[in-house]
Amino acid sequence: MQYIEMTGKTLLKLIDLTGLSQEELRKAGVRDDSLVRVTRLGDLELRKPHKWDAIGGLLGEFDHKLRHETGLDWA
């Protein structure tokens, strides 16, 4: 599986892609310094001490905007 990883701060800047509000992401545990990853299918996962937790997903045509905004490619 390929991912793009980013901080919670970056994810919160891309809020229009998530279909979730900042409040919902914060309730899920996303903080500015959180480690978050997105799968190619658009699944959002938050890094916890011993695992990754699914917290939602991205909507629409997120691929180009995600790569452009993060400066990263799928790895």
Regions found by a protein language model. Name each.
Residues 17-68:
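Acidic, low-complexity, intrinsically disordered interaction modules
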